[in-house]
């Protein structure tokens, strides 16, 4: 009988962990990044790597910033090559996965659920 839930392999989890740590490091240093990201504190909430290890979906949450989500996405997109090169130096693989950034709606959804529960 097949499993209904798909679990990540050990390699996916390990690569996601390495990418998460590398992203935190490069965002903390601020080198090689779009200048708009210098005063924009971001939290990397999770990294999900596809089964073929070719795509890393990185979810972020900004805090206390004047930038819109679209501006942050644009700045991250402009910095993608530098970030990918930094990650390539951290992993021991033939190729580096394509990094894709996504705004993490989980916090917003949790607030909406909490408000709905208060109204019951």
UniProtKB/Swiss-Prot annotation:
Top-level taxon of the source organism: Bacteria
S-S bridge residues: none
GO cellular component: cytosol
Keyword Plastid: no
Keywords for this protein: Cytoplasm, Ribosome biogenesis
Statement: the UniProt record of this protein carries the keyword Transferase: no
Cell compartments where the protein resides: Cytoplasm
Signal peptide: none
GO MF term (any one): ribosomal small subunit binding
GO BP: any one term: maturation of SSU-rRNA
Function: One of several proteins that assist in the late maturation steps of the functional core of the 30S ribosomal subunit. Associates with free 30S ribosomal subunits (but not with 30S subunits that are part of 70S ribosomes or polysomes). Required for efficient processing of 16S rRNA. May interact with the 5'-terminal helix region of 16S rRNA.
PANTHER family listed in its UniProt record: RIBOSOME-BINDING FACTOR A, CHLOROPLASTIC-RELATED
UniProt name for this protein: Ribosome-binding factor A
Lineage summary: Bacteria, Pseudomonadati, Pseudomonadota, Alphaproteobacteria, Rickettsiales
């Amino acid at each position: 009988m097949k499993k209904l839930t798909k679990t990540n392999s050990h390699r996916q989890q390990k690569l996601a962990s390495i990418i998460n740590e590398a992203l935190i490091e490069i965002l903390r240093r601020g080198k090689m990044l779009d200048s708009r990201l210098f005063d924009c504190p971001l939290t990397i909430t999770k990294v999900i790597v596809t089964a073929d290890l070719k795509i890393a979906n990185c979810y972020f949450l900004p805090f206390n910033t004047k930038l819109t989500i679209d501006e942050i996405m644009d700045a991250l997109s402009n910095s993608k090559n530098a970030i990918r090169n930094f990650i390539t130096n951290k992993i021991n693989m033939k190729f580096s996965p394509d990094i894709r950034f996504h705004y993490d709606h989980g916090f917003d959804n949790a607030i909406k659920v909490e408000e709905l529960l208060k109204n019951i």
